[in-house]
Amino acid sequence: MAFDPASLTFDANGLIPAVAQDHATGEVLMMAWMNAEAVARTVETGRVTYWSRSRQAFWVKGETSGHVQRLIELRIDCDRDCLLLLIEQEGPACHTNRRSCFYTALREGEERIILDPMV
């Protein structure tokens, strides 16, 4: 069956959450938003493209930083309202220069930084 981005369930703003996960390690790297066109561009090019809510523009991950995300597999959840992007990540995924945006853990009621910036 051919994939059609219009078959996904987008929110009132026309967006769907997309979680990026390292295809080899399973590490969750980041979450961002996509609209139907960003999904289509990602599938067509293999370069992950998000929708920047703050800039109201397409954001090709790594276009300016060089920290490219290559799509290995796109998975759709059971309600078709969330995407899992299995990717190959070049360099850090987070704008803080960390491998993952999920670098703060809650441990014993305290926030702890668990990932240092990559050098």
Curated annotation (Swiss-Prot):
Cofactor section: Mg(2+); Zn(2+)
Gene Ontology MF term list: magnesium ion binding; phosphoribosyl-AMP cyclohydrolase activity; zinc ion binding
GO BP of this protein: L-histidine biosynthetic process
Biological pathway: Amino-acid biosynthesis; L-histidine biosynthesis; L-histidine from 5-phospho-alpha-D-ribose 1-diphosphate: step 3/9
GO CC terms, sorted: cytoplasm
Subcellular location: Cytoplasm
UniProt keyword list: Amino-acid biosynthesis, Cytoplasm, Histidine biosynthesis, Hydrolase, Magnesium, Metal-binding, Zinc
Domain of life where this protein originates: Bacteria
EC numbers, comma separated: 3.5.4.19
Enzyme class, UniProt record, top EC level: hydrolase
Binding site for Mg(2+): 77, 79, 81
PANTHER family linked: HISTIDINE BIOSYNTHESIS BIFUNCTIONAL PROTEIN, HISTIDINE BIOSYNTHESIS BIFUNCTIONAL PROTEIN HIS7
Record-given protein name: Phosphoribosyl-AMP cyclohydrolase
Species of the source: Cereibacter sphaeroides (strain ATCC 17029 / ATH 2.4.9) (Rhodobacter sphaeroides)
Highest classification ranks of the organism: Bacteria, Pseudomonadati, Pseudomonadota, Alphaproteobacteria, Rhodobacterales
